[in-house]
Amino acid sequence: MISYSVMDNIKVLKKGIDISKIKAQLDQYPSDWGSQKGLDNAEIKDPHQYITSVDILQLVMGGITKKGEDVGNTEICIPTPAYEHHTEVLKYLGEQFSDIRRCGFLALPVDEIVGAHIDEGTYYLDKDRYHLSIQGQYKYIVGNEDVIVDAGTLLWFNNKMPHGTVNLGDETR
């Protein structure tokens, strides 16, 4: 892949990706948002501890073997019921990457942020993280670097550094 950036912690890999089929499937299955809640052998972070305005649609999420286990410390990956509905994003990602592990969509409302955080747990120690922007415009920040991201952009970021985002657009990103 060609990198469009000269930063160390954020690499814009592709711009101008046609995401129309991915977006169409998101629009076709609006009830998939949040559908991962309550799955057996899966863990959702405590909403009282991890307060966010982000809506989540997990396609493949982390799993656990026993109650109370930290999902960040397991290699278990569980396809959710929504997985079968979102073939276009899986097709695109499969063309770009040889192995897709945990995968989901995040919807961030206008003017909202995801504060700086580091992905916690042993799962993330040897995993790379990527974002494929589906709609809107946002600023992605990693350490002291930032980039403005538009729909149709694929980027890699260093999830071992503090990272976060702010929605700059006039629609949910």
Short names for language-model regions:
Residues 98:
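Extended, loop-rich substrate-binding clefts of extracytoplasmic carbohydrate-active enzymes
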Residues 116-117, 140-142, 157-170:
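Short beta-strand His + acidic residue motifs that chelate non-heme Fe in jelly-roll/DSBH
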Residues 1-95:
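Non-heme Fe(II)/2-oxoglutarate
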Residues 128-133, 154-157, 170-173:
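A short hydrophobic beta-strand segment most commonly corresponding to one strand
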Residues 115, 130-151:
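A short beta-strand-loop-beta hairpin characteristic of the jelly-roll/cupin
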Residues 105-124:
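Conserved short histidine dyad/triad with adjacent acidic residue
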